[in-house]
Every structure is written in structure tokens, then in C-alpha cells.
Amino acid sequence: MAARSKWLPILAVCCLLALGGCVALSGPPADSAYNWTTVTAVDSDTNEELATVDVRIADNGSLRYTGLSNTTSLGENEGMLFIHNSEGRYGYVMRNMAFAIDIVFINADGEITTIHHAEPDDDATFRGTGKYVLEVPYEYTTDNRIEEDDRIEIPEQYR
């Protein structure tokens, strides 16, 4: 009996160390966890193509939570498309962000409802209504004349 009680604390410490290692290894999703697609911004009045963006798809809770937090920058026509299960009012934050972005809320029909030009700020919440949220480089929407009421064409497989 004494031998058993001698090993119990050692076994407990080993279990805690193993559990701690599992938690440390289950950090944010790797870039390879994301699928990629291309979306197109279209002028609502003229149907002119304004820009195309290669986006990572964030379509589950873990990917949406992490977002661009572990990204150091975005390329010129690069972004992230967040896909929610249903249209609603959502709030986005700049958790652990090192650079500014535009946050574009898009309804289920692809119409832009709100555009925020967001500076890194852990305390700010950027709100809008939509089923999709597109994050692109800062002032990308201004530089490409993308405005509220314009459309974002999203491939059918992500609609």
C-alpha cells in the first residue's frame, strides 16, 4: 500500500504535464487550416468589376475567432471572408492585430451593408449586419471605389 501511495503524486504530475503539452499544441489554427477562394466586388449601378480579392475562408467558430490575429500583413488583393450560418448583427474586434484593415459587412444577397476602416484597437468593436464579413487591407475599399450597396460576388459553394 505504501508503494502505491508513493507513485500516485508522480503519476498525477505526469498527467498534468501531458495535459499541459496538449493545450500548448492546440493553439490557433495553422494557415493550412483555411480554404481559399476569390471574391469579386461589383459596382451596384454599372455592374463594373471593381476588384478581386483572394480570401481565406473562416467558416467555423475556431477560424472565425482567430481571424487575422496571427497574420502579420495582407497582400495587395488578399483578405479573409468570414461566413456565418445566418444573416444577423455581428461585432468584430481587432484582437492581437498588428495592422489596420477594412471590415466589410455583406448581406445574404451579396450587398455591402457597412464598411469600417479599422485601426488596431483591442477595445473597439466594429458592428454591422450581414451573413458575410470581408476583411481586406486598410483603405482597400476607398482605393477601389467600393461602397455600401455595391455587391460582393461569392462563389456558390460558400453561399
Residue ranges, per PLM feature:
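Hydrophobic alpha-helical segments
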Residues: 1-159
